[in-house]
């Protein structure tokens, strides 16, 4: 079974991603990982950190000469600002002189005014911390860089095993008019990444930028909605047999686990709930090579399984909780009214969030693909996929042949 985990703190020495269960023979390089990490840094409205943050990628294990080995894959993303934070984030106790110097450092000042909407408050109480630093270091969205690194391996596997492409775009930011056109195709990805807000429509882009400019002027932050599309998936990934095996639930759990994501929908999602049944589902018709559909309201999933249509997943991101116009809070050191701590932050990170949602969708799809088709090498997995696809085609073919004979 494909598994992944990340480790590291926002200002620590490095982030680490560990991927276990990937087959041998998948071609992926550190350059590809770095390219995906660069996409995560894209977006109008990002903060000052993006100007100097660099993701120094080192593959520690599991890949040799650009090909996976079948063992655990470990990827390190170094923190180029580590020298500034080494004393604050040191793993071992400091010597008395260094500890005394750190005592007077602004970087080490206790953070006792939790930010509404962040993990600070509950984390401090749950783990018994007097300072929010241990909470925010791990809760920070900086951790998603490690997920993107892991997801790069999953994307490479999906492309090489199934020909699947996973891409995303921003649907709306703040109160901007949402994009309501057809989903993008792989050939559109370069243009989307070239957009400062990763929009798939020029008018939508202008509306989103205007929202960001207004929020920046007001000292505020913005959320938004992103959509991920996966193209080329076969019928039958996932299962109807139990709740945890339904692909819907797996995707929703993975995407909701991203920092600041507060809602997930598959296909037309909540809009479907407002329709009558006759207008909510995707009717099927006989085609030359099997079943065809005129709509994709279900977003490629029915009964917890892929149905051969493009997968569409949307995620809603809340506004960033580190608000320049600081919100009211309580100083947990004194119990007094206070304003929340404020560190440098983005006005809007929705374009970057779209890339992270891509990552989590790719990881889940790679996992269910390996659960379905197995194999120790990419070649073996491909053989299993090809045999399954022939079987599916054969099940549809008799009906198609019968229609041809009748015609």
UniProtKB/Swiss-Prot annotation:
It catalyses: 5-O-(1-carboxyvinyl)-3-phosphoshikimate = chorismate + phosphate. CDD domains: Chorismate_synthase (cd07304). Residues 275-284 have a biased composition (Basic and acidic residues). It holds the Pfam family Chorismate_synt. One of its GO terms (molecular function) is FMN binding. This reaction introduces a second double bond into the aromatic ring system. Homotetramer. This is Chorismate synthase. It comes from Mycobacterium ulcerans (strain Agy99). The gene is aroC.
């Amino acid at each position: 079974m494909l598994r992944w985990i990340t480790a590291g703190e926002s200002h620590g020495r490095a982030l680490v991603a560990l991927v276990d269960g990937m087959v041998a023979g998948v071609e992926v390089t550190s350059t590809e990982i770095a390219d995906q990490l660069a996409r995560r840094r894209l977006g109008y409205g990002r903060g000052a950190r993006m100007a100097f943050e660099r993701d120094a990628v080192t593959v520690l294990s599991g890949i040799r000469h650009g090909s996976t080995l079948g063992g655990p894959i470990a990827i390190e993303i170094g923190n180029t600002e580590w020298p500034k934070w080494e004393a604050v984030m040191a793993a071992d106790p400091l010597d008395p002189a260094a500890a005394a110097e750190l005592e007077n450092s602004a970087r080490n000042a206790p953070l006792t005014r939790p930010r509404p909407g962040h993990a600070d408050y509950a984390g401090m109480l749950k783990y018994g911390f007097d300072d929010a630093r241990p909470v925010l270091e791990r809760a920070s969205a900086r951790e998603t860089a490690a997920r993107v690194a892991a997801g790069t391996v999953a994307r490479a596997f999906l492309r090489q095993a199934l020909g699947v492409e996973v891409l995303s775009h921003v649907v709306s930011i703040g109160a901007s008019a949402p994009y309501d056109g057809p989903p993008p195709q792989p050939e559109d990805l370069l243009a989307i990444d070239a957009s400062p807000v990763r929009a798939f429509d020029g008018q939508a882009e202008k509306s989103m930028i205007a929202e960001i400019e207004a929020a920046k002027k007001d000292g505020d932050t913005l959320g938004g909605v992103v959509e991920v599309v996966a193209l080329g998936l076969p019928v039958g990934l996932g299962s109807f047999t139990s709740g945890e095996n339904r692909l819907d639930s797996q995707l929703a759990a993975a995407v909701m686990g991203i920092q600041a994501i507060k809602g997930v929908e598959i296909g037309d999602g909540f809009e479907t709930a407002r329709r009558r049944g006759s207008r909510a589902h995707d009717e099927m018709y006989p085609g030359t090579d099997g079943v065809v559909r005129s709509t994709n309201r279900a977003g490629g999933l029915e009964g917890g399984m892929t149905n051969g249509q493009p997968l569409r997943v949307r995620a809603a991101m809340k506004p960033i909780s580190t608000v320049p116009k600081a919100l009211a809070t309580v100083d947990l050191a004194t119990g007094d009214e206070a304003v929340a701590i404020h560190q440098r932050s983005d006005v809007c990170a929705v374009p970057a969030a779209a890339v992270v949602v891509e990552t989590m969708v790719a990881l889940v799809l790679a996992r269910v693909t390996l659960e379905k088709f197995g194999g120790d090498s990419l070649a073996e997995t491909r053989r299993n996929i090809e045999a399954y696809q022939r079987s599916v085609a054969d099940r549809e073919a008799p009906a198609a042949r019968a229609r041809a004979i009748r015609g």
